[in-house]
């Protein structure tokens, strides 16, 4: 075992002394040392329930014959970090998390890891660490929040009933009393936000990849099932250590294709593009951005999940969960290995009945193409991403007039002041991985568009990214970004822009000579942040089309 390097032999006498100082009995020294990387914090609703899960994981590890050792990992709530300086830090924490897990596991020669996670950047960071370390690992996602319920019985959810409600109030659609009801009911307790936002999409994809146990991706945070999964995961990691089953044995190219297909079938968050690219890179899997679009054209959307649809995570869990989606996708799923022991097709076959109102069959899809599309064109030579599952039919082909803003704050002010009108294309730039820095989510302006009733008449494009809660004609991840001199930096107010999602086009309708003249006049702006972690991050982060990862190159 790896841990023998710190606990066996004469020369390890000091190491054993230090281990015994933590309370480890001599009788436990022969057991596998299992690290539990816990991202518990009472700052985040998705993570406040983890103390209970930690206990069940620990019980499972000891039941399985291992010895549990806990260490902490930070977490950021994107909802709380939204709309201010804090959002600059969200995506960069993904890299920090991967680095921290790697550091602790290597420094202490842990035999295996249980990675307890839930929210947006924590789960991909944990998966990146697992792929990079390639020692036995299992993921436990803490589970989604229940939908809120008001006195009149209707369901409430975070994005629709907070960010969008704020804009509806500003527009006079609802009054202050109704807004307060929304605020009080949108988030009823612990768990990741209720819809198919980034956290829940990543939990589902983790299960699809084979890196968590069945139902882990959808079982609610408050459920007893989640605790049983935590216990079983603790037992399973000891088995994985003994059998030397490693993440790269599971996270193969075929497993990533399955994850993308499930993502597309459910209409998941566009952030998953960034994260899957980054995880695949750590796993040594070649996964070009174009893969998402190739698979989208042959994978129909089978579910209509909140925020664009009516179903919540609790509905998906009851309907059959990830195994139900695999079953409905049928032969489109490749038979791959999972940590659980059964293959993906065996897991699909284990589900007898699927609620076809929630997870439709291939013969009756919600839409004929998957939820995510990759666009190219003169604005995005290296690509841009849109969650087409959240775009109305009317806006799939749209030509509009550019209204340019060099930050999210400027765009948000224009929206709330009524400057943006039907027929406009809001361009938010210098918000990419380098230019932001940190590639902030544009949830506030996109929610404002919907709340103001502009979702069928105004498009938004950015080199930033979007929350999983975003819906509407919102195109992000535009590459190259403005800070690198990408074409998005050269757009001017009044330019005409063509958005053609069916033909995967995003074009600036300005002649080439004019564009080149503008390029000759363009100079890179001064960095927005010049000190601290973000200044270092901006120097080493790559473009969105490669996953916005940090490299030593």
Curated annotation (Swiss-Prot):
It is an enzyme of class 4 (lyase). Disulfide bonds: none annotated. It catalyses: (2R)-2,3-dihydroxy-3-methylbutanoate = 3-methyl-2-oxobutanoate + H2O; (2R,3R)-2,3-dihydroxy-3-methylpentanoate = (S)-3-methyl-2-oxopentanoate + H2O. Its cofactor is [2Fe-2S] cluster; Mg(2+). Gene3D superfamilies: IlvD/EDD C-terminal domain-like. [2Fe-2S] cluster binds at residues 119, 193. Pathway: Amino-acid biosynthesis; L-isoleucine biosynthesis; L-isoleucine from 2-oxobutanoate: step 3/4; Amino-acid biosynthesis; L-valine biosynthesis; L-valine from pyruvate: step 3/4. The active site is at residue 467. GO terms for biological process: isoleucine biosynthetic process; L-valine biosynthetic process. Keywords: 2Fe-2S, Amino-acid biosynthesis, Branched-chain amino acid biosynthesis, Iron, Iron-sulfur, Lyase, Magnesium, Metal-binding. It comes from the Bacteria. Mg(2+) binds at residues 78, 120-121, 441. One of its GO terms (cellular component) is cytosol. InterPro entries: Dihydro-acid_dehy_C, DihydroxyA_deHydtase, DiOHA_6PGluconate_deHydtase_CS, ILV_EDD_C, ILV_EDD_N, IlvD/EDD_N. The modification N6-carboxylysine is found at residue 121. Binds 1 [2Fe-2S] cluster per subunit. This cluster acts as a Lewis acid cofactor. NCBIfam families: ilvD, PRK00911.1. PANTHER family: D-XYLONATE DEHYDRATASE (PTHR43661), D-XYLONATE DEHYDRATASE YAGF-RELATED (PTHR43661:SF3). Homodimer. Belongs to the IlvD/Edd family. HAMAP family: IlvD (MF_00012). Functions in the biosynthesis of branched-chain amino acids. Catalyzes the dehydration of (2R,3R)-2,3-dihydroxy-3-methylpentanoate (2,3-dihydroxy-3-methylvalerate) into 2-oxo-3-methylpentanoate (2-oxo-3-methylvalerate) and of (2R)-2,3-dihydroxy-3-methylbutanoate (2,3-dihydroxyisovalerate) into 2-oxo-3-methylbutanoate (2-oxoisovalerate), the penultimate precursor to L-isoleucine and L-valine, respectively. This is Dihydroxy-acid dehydratase. The gene is ilvD.
């Amino acid at each position: 075992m790896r841990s023998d390097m710190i606990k066996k032999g004469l020369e390890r006498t000091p190491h054993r002394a230090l281990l015994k100082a933590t309370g480890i009995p001599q009788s436990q020294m022969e057991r596998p040392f299992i690290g539990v990387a816990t991202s518990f914090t009472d700052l985040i609703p998705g993570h406040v329930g983890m103390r209970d899960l930690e206990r069940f994981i620990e019980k499972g590890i000891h039941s399985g014959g291992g010895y549990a050792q806990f260490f902490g990992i930070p977490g950021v709530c994107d909802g709380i970090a939204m709309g201010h300086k804090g959002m600059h830090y969200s995506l960069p924490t993904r890299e920090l998390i991967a680095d921290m897990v790697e550091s602790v596991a290597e420094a202490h020669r842990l035999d295996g890891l249980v990675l307890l996670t839930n929210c947006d950047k924590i789960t991909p960071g944990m998966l990146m660490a697992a792929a990079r370390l390639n020692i036995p690992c299992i993921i436990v996602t803490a589970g989604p929040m229940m939908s809120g319920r008001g006195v009149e019985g209707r369901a409430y959810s975070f994005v629709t009933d907070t960010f969008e409600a704020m804009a509806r109030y500003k527009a006079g659609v609802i009054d202050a009393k109704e807004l307060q009801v929304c605020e009080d009911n949108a988030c009823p307790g612990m768990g990741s936000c209720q819809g198919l936002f980034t956290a829940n999409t990543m939990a589902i994809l983790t299960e699809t990849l084979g890196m968590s146990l069945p139902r882990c991706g959808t079982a609610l945070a408050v459920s007893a099932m989640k605790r049983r999964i935590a216990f079983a995961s603790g037992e399973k990691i000891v088995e994985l250590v003994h059998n030397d089953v490693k993440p790269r044995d599971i996270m193969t190219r075929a497993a990533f294709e399955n994850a993308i297909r499930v993502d597309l079938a459910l209409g998941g968050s566009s952030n998953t593009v960034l994260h899957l690219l980054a995880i695949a890179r750590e796993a040594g899997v070649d996964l070009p951005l174009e893969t998402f679009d190739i698979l989208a054209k042959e994978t129909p959307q089978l579910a209509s999940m909140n925020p664009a649809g009516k179903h919540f995570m609790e509905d998906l869990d009851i309907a059959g969960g990830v195994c139900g989606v695999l079953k409905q996708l049928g032969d489109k799923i490749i038979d791959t290995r999972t940590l659980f022991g059964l293959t993906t097709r065996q897991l699909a076959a284990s589900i007898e009945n699927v609620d076809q109102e929630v997870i439709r069959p291939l013969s009756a899809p919600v839409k004929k193409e998957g939820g995510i599309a990759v666009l190219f064109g003169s604005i995005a030579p290296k690509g841009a991403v849109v969650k087409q599952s959240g775009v109305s039919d009317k806006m799939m082909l749209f030509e509009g007039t550019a209204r340019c803003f060099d930050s999210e704050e400027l765009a948000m002010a224009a929206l709330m002041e009524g400057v943006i009108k039907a027929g406009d294309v809001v361009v938010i730039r210098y918000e990419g991985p380098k230019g932001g820095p940190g590639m902030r989510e544009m949830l506030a302006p996109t929610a404002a568009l919907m709340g103001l009733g502009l979702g069928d008449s105004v498009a938004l494009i950015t080199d930033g990214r979007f929350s999983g809660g975003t819906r509407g004609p919102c195109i992000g991840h535009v590459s190259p970004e403005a800070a690198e001199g990408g074409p998005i930096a050269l757009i001017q107010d009044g330019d005409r822009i063509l958005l053609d999602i069916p033909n995967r086009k995003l074009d600036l309708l300005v002649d080439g000579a004019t564009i080149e003249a503008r390029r000759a006049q363009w100079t890179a702006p001064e960095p927005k942040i010049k000190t601290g972690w973000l200044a270092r991050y901006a120097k080493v982060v790559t473009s969105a089309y490669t996953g916005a990862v940090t490299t030593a190159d």
